[in-house]
């Protein structure tokens, strides 16, 4: 067994309580109301996964964690952080003996429950520790291969996620433009457009 329990912290205690009420039966969770209690509950060398809004919020949480962790511990930034910020933070934490892993995660809320696609960067040493855990929770391809691989050092994970998001948004734009052309140029009704989109399912145009 890779881990016996998962420590949980949110600065809004009510959100932690809602998670416990909803998913307590899914595993063994250890809720904390203070960040210091959260870090104290982790087995050494500690792994702390941060998933908050990119930018100042991420920086604030990482700064707070860095003051509570010890050399050899790992901080995983699983938000949509700009890869250059990840490179800067990784270098700063490395000077303190801490490891930062910038990790792209794709799948949304459904992926969190059923298995996401995971794109971790960071040092090879960090992935040796994280790899088995990530592979156990990631989505799986049709051949059973976990949808996770170490994509490179420092900000590589967030760089790959940035490219992933760019492709996804381009696909969404193509779908929107196809809808607009079918409606305004083709003169199709909304139900007719829906029928066209349905006919594309299972083909090379499926999305």
Where are these regions (language model features)?
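Rossmann-like NAD(P)-binding element
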Residues: 11, 15, 19-88, 92-98, ...
């Amino acid at each position: 067994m890779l881990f016996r329990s998962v420590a949980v912290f949110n600065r809004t205690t009510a959100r932690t309580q809602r998670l416990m009420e909803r998913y307590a039966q899914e595993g063994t969770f250890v809720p904390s109301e203070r960040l210091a209690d959260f870090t104290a509950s982790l087995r050494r060398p500690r792994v702390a996964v941060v998933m908050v809004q990119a930018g100042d919020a991420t920086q604030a949480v990482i700064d707070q964690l860095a003051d509570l962790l010890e050399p050899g511990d790992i901080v995983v930034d699983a938000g949509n952080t700009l890869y250059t910020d990840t490179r800067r933070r990784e270098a700063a934490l490395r000077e303190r003996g801490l490891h930062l892993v910038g990790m792209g995660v794709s799948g949304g809320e459904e992926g969190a429950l059923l298995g996401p696609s995971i794109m971790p960067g960071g040092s090879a040493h960090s992935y040796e520790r994280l790899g088995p855990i990530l592979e156990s929770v990631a989505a799986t391809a049709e051949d059973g291969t976990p949808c996770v691989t170490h994509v490179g050092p420092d900000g590589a994970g967030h760089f790959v996620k940035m490219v992933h998001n760019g492709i996804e948004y381009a696909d969404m734009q193509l779908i929107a433009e196809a809808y607009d052309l079918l409606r305004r140029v083709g003169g199709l009704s909304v139900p007719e457009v829906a029928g066209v989109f349905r006919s594309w399912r299972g083909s090379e145009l499926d999305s």
